[in-house]
């Protein structure tokens, strides 16, 4: 899911 991605890329572009 997307949570697995956001763990290494918080909210930085």
From Swiss-Prot:
<dbReference type="GO" id="GO:0005576">
    <property type="term" value="C:extracellular region"/>
</dbReference>
<keyword id="KW-0964">Secreted</keyword>
<feature type="modified residue" description="Proline amide">
    <location>
        <position position="13"/>
    </location>
</feature>
<dbReference type="GO" id="GO:0006952">
    <property type="term" value="P:defense response"/>
</dbReference>
<protein>
    <recommendedName>
        <fullName>Electrin-2.2</fullName>
    </recommendedName>
</protein>
<keyword id="KW-0027">Amidation</keyword>
<keyword id="KW-0878">Amphibian defense peptide</keyword>
């Amino acid at each position: 899911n997307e949570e697995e991605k956001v763990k290494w890329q918080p909210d930085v572009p």
